[in-house]
Structures are given as structure tokens and as C-alpha cells.
Curated annotation (Swiss-Prot):
Gene that specifies this protein: fumC
HAMAP family according to UniProt: FumaraseC
Active-site residues annotated for this sequence: H188, S318
CC per GO annotation: cytoplasm
GO process annotations (BP): fumarate metabolic process; tricarboxylic acid cycle
EC numbers for this chain: 4.2.1.2
Protein name: Fumarate hydratase class II
Gene3D superfamilies: Fumarase/aspartase (C-terminal domain) (1.10.40.30), Fumarase/aspartase (Central domain) (1.20.200.10), Fumarase/aspartase (N-terminal domain) (1.10.275.10)
Entry's family note: Belongs to the class-II fumarase/aspartase family. Fumarase subfamily.
Keyword Manganese found: no
Source species: Halobacterium salinarum (strain ATCC 700922 / JCM 11081 / NRC-1)
Pathway: Carbohydrate metabolism; tricarboxylic acid cycle; (S)-malate from fumarate: step 1/1
Length: 470
């Protein structure tokens, strides 16, 4: 940034602003007031601010509230913000005033000065005024929650859902590929009745698909926009047709359907929709964590673990142990889950706060939500493409472990009864024999009957196995 400065003014007086900056006095005050985290809003939220300001200018132009020349210049400047041409002009820390006023004014000042420049005027001369023109009929109290919903729903629809769909597709492929592989089921991390590896992967696929359903279910609440409520939800200083008109332009710009909030007081004083939607993200993160942990266990080894699946060699696993390969992508998914849980705690706390007519945790809600969405979108796609897609079944290990399993005795219950089946299982464990060997030795079943009743593949289907051929 240039060492030269220009003088900008707001209602509190003059401020020195870098000469090549599009922001003005209020943004500069925020920069100086909030040296908190060094974290500014990212691309998605800045884009959403541009979308809101563009739609507001279009609506105000249509309603005859801002003249065509200025409105068109604001629209052009906002288009540049939407395209990411001015991301470096949004330096305000996410930890700021709870209404997000600093970020709203940051957008107003950048767009006003760039619009003036497009009109052939000088930056800072206020021919396009940040409040009177760019922010006409708006308040930070309705702009920021509107941008929150626009950015959040955009993230869910265009990134999180496709990422999860990628993962679900890879899991579905493995469910088909592994459907003929019979393995030992496990409950309480102890041997249980047989299951097909494909059935387990089908369960994982369904978990992810239900996660997509949960995300889609919260979309209607996020599609409601606070814009038009102005300061406290009454709509003071805004045209009666402004909210609906602006929402139409936002829908057109994003390709996602948005509408005016059912109740502007609720839309500004509470952020239950953000809390609910992030709850869906937290649930999805938990599902991915469970799947990642299961796959890590199934791939444990390669010689002294379960070893039922073979993991991809994504990268060397150890700086000291040659040849070691770790489930690094699955571990990354585990860590994303922990961060999402932390973000959820912040969002739940922030959504429960705010006094009377305004929730004052808007920036931290937006930041944490969008971070979770970005991480889950990226983690889902990477998990599917770089880990799940490259998994292979270790059929020999699966078969060997099934043959040794004491849980096969469960299938004996309908034929010889629970007590005798327990006797067989205990004897097999004590004597180091298979269940089949013991049940035949004790004379409870013939070899042919045992082969029918103790068929591992048959146990993976609903029904009662019997040694009776009739």
C-alpha cells in the first residue's frame, strides 16, 4: 500500500486514508479500532455484500429513489466486488461491532468511491455517497443478516452439497464393488455376526445422503432475507416495494431463490436459522468423522491390525519409520469435525445472545458458519476422491477372520438353542477351534447341516438358516 494518504471525512471528523485505497474514513476507523485477530471476511462474504449492494441499487433505481447514473455506477462497482476484483479493499477484522456496521460501511465506501471513479470523478469527493446512495433505504442491521443468509445458502447449495454428493457417489461405488466380500461384523469393538463389506459402505453412503437431506431441509429458513427492515425491523426510510424487489434481484444474481423475511423483527433480532443450519453442518461433520474413524480401523495394520481394507498410499506416513503409510486424509476429516464442533459452540452461543431488537453477534456467526461450510465442502470431496475411491478390499483377511469368529454361533440359536450355541462358542474359543468344528464334534449337527446353518454369506441376509433340506 502506498505511503501517500488522502483526507476523508465522516460524522466524527477527518481521517487519513491510504491514497490508493477505495475505503473511506469509517473503514479506516475500524482498521484502527479492531486490531484483534488479523482475520478479515473471506471471498464468499465479500461477494455476498456486493450482491446485496447491487440488488439494493437496482431496486432503488427501479423505484426512482436513486438516479439512473449513480445507480448504474453503483451496480458496475458492485459487479467488480462480486467478481473479486477488490477483495484487498475489505480489511476489517471479523471481530468488530456486533452488528457488522464496519463491514457494511466498508462495502458502502469501497463501492461509492469506485462508482465515483467510474463516473470520471475523484475518489473521496462523495459524488456517489456511501450512505445517501449506496446504503439508501438500508441499515447495517438488515444488510449484514441478508449477506449472512446469501453467503451461507450459497455455500450450502454450491459447495457443501456437491462435495457431499461426490463422497456419496464414491461410497456407492465401493458398496457395489465390495458387496460380495463377507467379513466379521463388530459391535462394541467385539466380534459380531457376519456382514458384507458392501453393506457397511452402503450404510456410510446413506449417512452422507441423509446429511444432504438435512442441509436441504434448512434452506427455506436461510432463503428469508432481512433486507428492508432497516434499523429495528420497522422498515423506516425504505420503500414498501424495496424488500421484494431487491430479493428478486438477489435471486437473479445468485441463481438461488430468496424472498423477503416473514417477520423482519425476528430476522434481525435473532439468528435461529443460522444456528439451525449450522446444526445440520455439525451433524454432517459427525457423520464424516464416524466414517473416517471406521475406515481407519478397518485399514489398521497392515500386519497387526484388522486389515480388512487396504488404504491408498497418499504420502509417506513417518519421518522415522520407513515404509509406514497413514490414513492422512481420514485424519484430516477427523480434525475438520473437531473444528466444526468448536464453531458450532460459538454459533450456538452467539445465536442465543443479543438484546431486544438486534442480535449483536453477526460477524462471528457469519465467519464461523462459512469456515465450517468451506472445510466440509473441501473435506468431503477430498475424502471421496483421494481416500474412499482408492480403497481396496482385503478379501483373504476378511474370509480368515469370519472363519475364526465365535459370533457365527448366533446362527445356531434357532436350530440347537441358545444354551447349546453358547456352549459351542465357549468351547471353540477355549480349544482354538472353529464353531463348525465344535458343533460337529459334539454331534449337534452333521457336517452338511453345519455347512448350511453356518454359511457366513447366508448370515448377511434377513432370515433363519436351517440344516433342514426340506
Amino acid at each position: 500500500m502506498s505511503e501517500d494518504y488522502r483526507t476523508e471525512q465522516d460524522s466524527l471528523g477527518e481521517m487519513q486514508v491510504p491514497a490508493d485505497a477505495y475505503w473511506g474514513a469509517q473503514t479506516q476507523r475500524a482498521i484502527e479500532n479492531f486490531p484483534i485477530s488479523g482475520i478479515a471476511f473471506g471471498r464468499r462474504f465479500v461477494r455476498a455484500l456486493g450482491v446485496v449492494k447491487k440488488a439494493a441499487a437496482q431496486a432503488n433505481r427501479d423505484l426512482g429513489l436513486v438516479d439512473d447514473e449513480r445507480a448504474d455506477a453503483i451496480v458496475a462497482a458492485a459487479d467488480e466486488v462480486i467478481a473479486g476484483e477488490h477483495d484487498d479493499q475489505f480489511p476489517v477484522d471479523v471481530f468488530q461491532t456486533g452488528s457488522g456496521t464496519s463491514s457494511n460501511m466498508n462495502a458502502n465506501e469501497v463501492i461509492a468511491n469506485r462508482a465515483a471513479e467510474l463516473l470520471g470523478e475523484e475518489i473521496g469527493d462523495r459524488v456517489v455517497h456511501p450512505n445517501d446512495h449506496v446504503n439508501y433505504g438500508q441499515s447495517s442491521n438488515d444488510v449484514i443478516p441478508t449477506a449472512m443468509h446469501v453467503a451461507s445458502l450459497d455455500a450450502l447449495v454450491n459447495d457443501v452439497k456437491p462435495g457431499l454428493e461426490t463422497l456419496a457417489a464414491e461410497l456407492d461405488d465401493k458398496a457395489d464393488a465390495f458387496d460380495g466380500v463377507v467379513k466379521t461384523g463388530r459391535t462394541h469393538l467385539q466380534d459380531a455376526t457376519p456382514v458384507r463389506l458392501g453393506q457397511e459402505f452402503g450404510g456410510y453412503r446413506t449417512q452422507v445422503e441423509k446429511g444432504i437431506d438435512r442441509i436441504e431441509a434448512v434452506a427455506p429458513r436461510l432463503s428469508e432475507l432481512a433486507l428492508g427492515g432497516t434499523a429495528v425491523g420497522t422498515g423506516l426510510n425504505t420503500h414498501p416495494e424495496f424488500p421484494e424487489t431487491a430479493a428478486g434481484y438477489i435471486s437473479e444474481e445468485t441463481g438461488v431463490t430468496f424472498r423477503e423475511a416473514d417477520n423482519h423483527f425476528e430476522a434481525q433480532a435473532a439468528h435461529d436459522a443460522m444456528n439451525e443450519a449450522h446444526g445440520a453442518l455439525r451433524t454432517v461433520a459427525g457423520s464424516l468423522n464416524k466414517i473416517a474413524n471406521d475406515l481407519r480401523l478397518l485399514a489398521s495394520g497392515p500386519r497387526n491390525g484388522l486389515g480388512e481394507i487396504e488404504q491408498p498410499e497418499n504420502q509417506p506416513g513417518s519421518s522415522i519409520m520407513p515404509g509406514k503409510i497413514n490414513p492422512v486424509v481420514a485424519e484430516a476429516v477427523n480434525q475438520v469435525h473437531k473444528q466444526v464442533v468448536g464453531n458450532d459452540a460459538a454459533i450456538a452461543a452467539g445465536a442465543a445472545e443479543g438484546q431486544i431488537d438486534l442480535n449483536l453477534y453477526k460477524p462471528v456467526l457469519a465467519h464461523n458458519f462459512l469456515q465450517s461450510a468451506d472445510m466440509l465442502a473441501n473435506a468431503s470431496a477430498a475424502f471421496g476422491e483421494k481416500f474412499v475411491a482408492k480403497l481396496e478390499a482385503n478379501e483373504a483377511a476378511c474370509e480368515a477372520q469370519v472363519e475364526r469368529s465365535m459370533a457365527l454361533a448366533t446362527a445356531l440359536n434357532p436350530t440347537i438353542g441358545y444354551d447349546k450355541a453358547s456352549e459351542v462358542a465357549k468351547a471353540a474359543l477355549k480349544e482354538g477351534k472353529t464353531v463348525t468344528e465344535v458343533v460337529v464334534e459334539k454331534g449337534y449337527l452333521s457336517e452338511a447341516e453345519a455347512a448350511d446353518v453356518l454359511d457366513p454369506e447366508g448370515m448377511t441376509h434377513r432370515g433363519i438358516l436351517s440344516g433342514d433340506d426340506t
